[in-house]
Amino acid sequence: MMDASKELQVLHIDFLNQDNAVSHHTWEFQTSSPVFRRGQVFHLRLVLNQPLQSYHQLKLEFSTGPNPSIAKHTLVVLDPRTPSDHYNWQATLQNESGKEVTVAVTSSPNAILGKYQLNVKTGNHILKSEENILYLLFNPWCKEDMVFMPDEDERKEYILNDTGCHYVGAARSIKCKPWNFGQFEKNVLDCCISLLTESSLKPTDRRDPVLVCRAMCAMMSFEKGQGVLIGNWTGDYEGGTAPYKWTGSAPILQQYYNTKQAVCFGQCWVFAGILTTVLRALGIPARSVTGFDSAHDTERNLTVDTYVNENGEKITSMTHDSVWNFHVWTDAWMKRPDLPKGYDGWQAVDATPQERSQGVFCCGPSPLTAIRKGDIFIVYDTRFVFSEVNGDRLIWLVKMVNGQEELHVISMETTSIGKNISTKAVGQDRRRDITYEYKYPEGSSEERQVMDHAFLLLSSEREHRRPVKENFLHMSVQSDDVLLGNSVNFTVILKRKTAALQNVNILGSFELQLYTGKKMAKLCDLNKTSQIQGQVSEVTLTLDSKTYINSLAILDDEPVIRGFIIAEIVESKEIMASEVFTSFQYPEFSIELPNTGRIGQLLVCNCIFKNTLAIPLTDVKFSLESLGISSLQTSDHGTVQPGETIQSQIKCTPIKTGPKKFIVKLSSKQVKEINAQKIVLITK
C-alpha cells in the first residue's frame, strides 16, 4: 500500500477570478462563486502538496444537479494529461511550476446551464469543498452556442447593459420609464440559478435556451405556490408595492431569493423587467419591448370584439377581449433548431400572466419571423402574439328590436392594433421603432396577405371581415394629451360622400381607466346635436376637468381617459363609432448633478420642481436610485401649491467605477410619477 504521506493531494483551487472574469465578460457579477460562459476556455491553478509526477492520478469532476451521472451529462470527468473529448468538454495542462499546475478547461457549447461542483480526484484522495462551486452560463460570444449574437454592440446592450427603460403611455404620447435591470447586483444571479432548480426543467433541458426561456417565463408569475411576482390590476395595493413604484428588477429578485415568498405586486412592465433581467443574467440576449394599442384576444379568433349598448357603454358581460394602451414583454435572441429553417433570431416571450400555454401561465418563445409571416401555429403561442400586434378590431352595437338583441358592426378597424412597437436603441438612450420586425406596414398588400394567410390557417369563417354595407359616413376622433387639471377637447371629424345639410347626433361616453382598459370610474356622458354641411365637418365635445380631478387621488395607478363616441346621421340612420384615449401631461423637474465623481467622495443631487399645474399636489416625494451608487432614497415634501417651487438635496457615495445612471422620480397622489435621469462618470 502506498504511503499516505506520499499520495498526491490538491490543497486548494485558485479559479483565477480576475483573468477569467474579464475574458468571460462576467467581472461585474457580485457573487462569491466564479462565473463562466460555456464553450469558452477558463483556467484553474491547482495548489498541490508535492510536484506533479507522471505516475500521479489527476482528474477533474464537474457535477450539476441531484444524483449526477455521466450518462445524463450531469457529471463530466476530465484527465488534463490525457486530452480527450468528454461530451465536448476538454482539459489540458498549461503550466507546471513546483507544487502548482495550471489547467485549461473548455466546457461544451451545449453544456448544461447552472451551478456546478468541482471536485479534484488524485488517487484515493478527493478534494471536495463548498468553496469550489462555479456557475456556467449561456455564451453569446461563442459561435457554437445557440444564443450566439454576432454584433458586439448588441451583446453589450442585450447582455451587459444593466440599465435601460420601458416605453409606456399611449401611441400618440410615448413616455420613457427608466428601469434598472441590475443583473449583476448581489444575489440576482444566485436567484436566477435557484429559479432553474425550482422550475420544472430537467437538468438536461437546461442546455436549451428555448426551454430555459419558457421555464423562466413561467417562473416570473406566482401560481400554485410558486413564482416570483404576484400580478395585481385592481388598483388596491395594500400589503405590497404599487407596480408603478418599482424602479428596477434587483429589489424584487433579491426579496424573492431571501424570503422564498412571492413579491407583491407587478404589472406588465414589471414582469417584462424581471424576465429581461433573468435572461441577461443567464446569458440569453434580451430586450424589453412595448406595443401600443395591444390586443388581448381571449377568443383566439384573431379579432378583438367590443360590444356596446345604444348609450355607448361597453357591455362587460359580452366583451371578453380587450385592448391595452400599451403592453410590455421581452424579446430573447436564440436559434430555433426545433423549428424549420428561417425562425432563428428574436423570439417574443411574455411573462405577464394572461392565458395558459400547455397548462401554465407563460407565452413564447415565439419567433418574430413567424409573427410577421402569420405562421400562427409555429410554437410557442404565435397565434396569441400575432393577435396582440396585428389583429383586426370590431365594435358591435347591441340593439333591442322587438325584445330581441340585434348585433350591428359599427366599426371595423384593420390598422388600430399594434402601433409603434418600441425598444431602447443599442448604445443610446432613445426609442427605436421595431414595428417592421413584427409586421408589414399597416394597409399594405403584404399585411393583408399575411392576415388572409393567418385566417386560412385558423380555418375560421370570416363573415365579419366582409363589408357589412357600403359606408357613406366615416368618423375619427382626435384628442391631444392634456396638462393635468385642464379641460379635455375631443374633436369628432366626420367625412361623408355628400355635402348636403344633415343633422348628426353625437354621443360621448367617458370613463377613467387603467392602461389595460379596466374601468375605474365613470366620468360622464356628453350629447350634442349639430347641423353639418360639406363633405368634411368637425364637432367638438369638451370634458371639464372637474369631472375627473377628484377621481385621480383615489387611484394608485397611472390613469387614462377613455372616450367612446357614437355618431348617427338623423336622416339616413347611418351609425359609426370610434374610441379614443387621452393621457395626462405633467410639468418637468430639473436635477443638478456633476458630470463626474470619485469612489468614496460624496455626490449631491439637487432636485428642483415648480408646480405649474392649476391644482395642488399632495404627498409629494422625491426619490433617487443608482446601481452601484445608491439604493433607493426618498424625501417627503407634503403638499405643493400651484405656482410653488420646492427643492431637495439627496446625497450618496459611489462604491463602483464606470458610467452610472442616476434615476430621480417625483410622485404625488395626483401625479404618479415624473422621471429624470443623468449619467455620471465615476472614477477611482
Swiss-Prot record:
GO molecular function, a single term: metal ion binding
Cellular component GO terms held in the UniProt record: collagen-containing extracellular matrix; cytoplasm; extracellular exosome; Golgi apparatus
UniProt-annotated catalytic positions: C268, H327, D350
Catalysed reactions, as listed in the record: L-glutaminyl-[protein] + L-lysyl-[protein] = [protein]-L-lysyl-N(6)-5-L-glutamyl-[protein] + NH4(+)
Binding locations of Ca(2+): N390, D392, E442, E447
Cofactor(s), names only, from the UniProt record: Ca(2+)
InterPro entries hit by this protein: Ig-like_fold, Ig_E-set, Papain-like_cys_pep_sf, Transglutaminase, Transglutaminase-like, Transglutaminase-like_sf, Transglutaminase_animal, Transglutaminase_AS
Tissue specificity statement from the Swiss-Prot or TrEMBL entry: Prostate.
Annotated keywords: Acyltransferase, Calcium, Metal-binding, Transferase
Pfam families, per database record: Transglut_C, Transglut_core, Transglut_N
Enzyme Commission number(s) of this protein: 2.3.2.13
Enzyme class: transferase
Cofactor binding note of this UniProt entry: Binds 1 Ca(2+) ion per subunit.
Cystines in this chain: none
Role summary: Associated with the mammalian reproductive process. Catalyzes the cross-linking of proteins and the conjugation of polyamines to specific proteins in the seminal tract.
Family: Belongs to the transglutaminase superfamily. Transglutaminase family.
Assembly and interaction partners: Homodimer.
Protein name (record): Protein-glutamine gamma-glutamyltransferase 4
Source organism (scientific name): Homo sapiens (Human)
